[in-house]
Design a protein with these regions (language model features):
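Helix-adjacent hinge/juxtasegments
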Residues: 57-64, 69-86, 94
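Short, charged, surface-exposed secondary-structure boundary motifs
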Residues: 68-71, 85, 121-124, 142-147
Length: 147
C-alpha cells in the first residue's frame, strides 16, 4: 500500500524508497521545479542551486515565470518547449495532484514531491502512468547522503 508509515517518515509504495530509485531520479538531467521563484529564503531556491551545481538543467515553473539562477522560467509545465525528465514539486500538498497530472500529460519520466508534500493518490497515478515517483524526500538531502 502506498504511503506506508515507517519510522515517522512517509515512504514509497511497498516500503522504503529503494536507493536505486533515488539514484535513477538523480541521474536524470532536466528538472522542472514547480514553485521555484527568486525568493532566496525558500527551500526551492537552494535546491535549484544545488541541482545546477550537480550538472542538472533546472527549469523554474511558477506563475510569475521568473528567470532564476540564470534559467528562464515558465508559467506552467505545458509551456516548457522541450522534454522534462523530473518534475520537482514545491507546492502545497493540496495542489500537488494537479502538478502530477500535468507531469503525466507532458510525459515526464518522474515526479519528486518534496518534504511534507504528500499526495498518495497522485503518486499512485504517476506510478500507474509509468513514472518514477518519490514523495516526502528532498534531492538536496539525498545528494548529501551519496559519495
Amino acid at each position: 500500500m502506498l504511503g506506508v508509515q515507517l519510522d515517522g517518515n512517509l515512504e514509497h509504495s511497498g516500503g522504503p524508497i529503494m536507493s536505486d530509485q533515488i539514484d535513477q531520479m538523480l541521474g536524470l538531467k532536466t528538472w522542472a521545479i514547480v514553485g521555484l521563484s527568486n525568493n532566496s529564503e525558500r527551500a526551492a531556491f537552494g535546491v535549484a542551486k544545488l541541482l545546477i551545481e550537480k550538472g542538472h538543467q533546472v527549469i523554474p515553473v511558477h506563475p510569475k515565470a521568473e528567470t532564476v539562477h540564470g534559467q528562464k522560467g515558465y508559467e506552467k509545465l505545458s509551456d516548457v518547449p522541450f522534454p522534462i525528465d523530473v518534475v520537482d514539486i514545491f507546492v502545497n500538498s493540496d495542489l500537488a495532484g494537479e502538478v502530477v497530472d500535468s507531469a503525466i500529460a507532458i510525459n515526464a519520466k518522474g515526479v519528486w514531491l518534496q518534504l511534507d508534500v504528500i499526495d498518495q493518490s497522485a503518486v499512485e497515478r504517476a506510478e500507474n502512468a509509468g513514472l518514477i515517483a518519490v514523495m516526502n524526500r528532498c534531492p538536496a538531502i539525498e545528494y548529501r547522503k551519496r559519495p
